[in-house]
Amino acid sequence: MIDGRYEPATIEEETRITLENIGRILASAGAGFDDVVRCGCFLADINDFDAMNGVYAGYFTDPRPARTTVQVAALPGGIKVEIDCVVLLPK
């Protein structure tokens, strides 16, 4: 989703797009992925965990932020993944 409209994608594509959007939000606040201290990952299908995790791992370095990943009954617009983050903004 770049212009606000959702285009169906694989879980890997959706995860990448989601994390790229998060990266832009972080950058606009003067932060980066290293400033993320916690993430919540919500999957429409927990069977997508390994594929989502493979993409997710490429955006964070050790020590990675604390994370909770759960399956939910549904996500808006038929999306497969939603990620929220808590960030410690640099001073």
Stretch-by-stretch model annotation:
Residues 1-91:
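Short, polar/acidic, helix-capping and beta-turn segments at strand->helix junctions
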